[in-house]
Amino acid sequence: MYNVFDEYSQKAKNEGYLARSVYKLIEIDKKFSLFSSGNILDIGASPGSFSQYAYANLKNGVLVAVDLNDVNLNFTSNFYFIKGNIYLDEVYQKIKIFSPYSLIVSDAAPSTTGNRLVDTSNSFNLNIRIFELACESLMRGGNLLIKVFQGGEEEQIFYKLKSCFRVVKKVRPKAVRKNSFEIYFLAKDFAKL
């Protein structure tokens, strides 16, 4: 088990972020420049730290956040929250209203069971759905960042990304806990299928 409250948790609290995970996004953005003009989609937004950072970097667009759970974000404009399951068509139709997106970020993870085989399989299925959404709603030249659990069939996702993005990288930010089997796949410069 890991220490729930660590240096990144303290830093997030001090800087007003809702979760420590924001530092994963910050590190990746500083290294790879994720943000450009246009709409942004945050999938698996709760508790909201990715959305906080994305909103602060919003350029001429709207931020759309989607999650099964509520988020406690009080942005004054250019923000829409969709509560629901991304596998449902009614949720997809709401997401589609704001497309195309210049950036889709996802720190989403399935509910974990403690069984790595089950957890990586569920992560794979979730990321396949996010990949499908990205293919349907990213603008040409757009970027995608997804969290992936290692140890399953994640290489299939990586190769799918390589088939429609010009640059695809595996990234493990410093803020990822040492005992975690999560990494991020960063896909830049989407070329429509």
Curated annotation (Swiss-Prot):
It catalyses: uridine(2552) in 23S rRNA + S-adenosyl-L-methionine = 2'-O-methyluridine(2552) in 23S rRNA + S-adenosyl-L-homocysteine + H(+). S-adenosyl-L-methionine binds at residues 48, 50, 67, 85, 107. Keywords: Cytoplasm, Methyltransferase, rRNA processing, S-adenosyl-L-methionine, Transferase. The active site is at residue 147. Its main location: cytoplasm. Its EC number is 2.1.1.166. It is found in: Cytoplasm. GO terms for molecular function: rRNA (uridine-2'-O-)-methyltransferase activity. GO terms for cellular component: cytoplasm. It is an enzyme of class 2 (transferase). Specifically methylates the uridine in position 2552 of 23S rRNA at the 2'-O position of the ribose in the fully assembled 50S ribosomal subunit. Belongs to the class I-like SAM-binding methyltransferase superfamily. RNA methyltransferase RlmE family. PANTHER family: RIBOSOMAL RNA METHYLTRANSFERASE, RRNA METHYLTRANSFERASE 2, MITOCHONDRIAL. This is Ribosomal RNA large subunit methyltransferase E. The gene is rlmE.
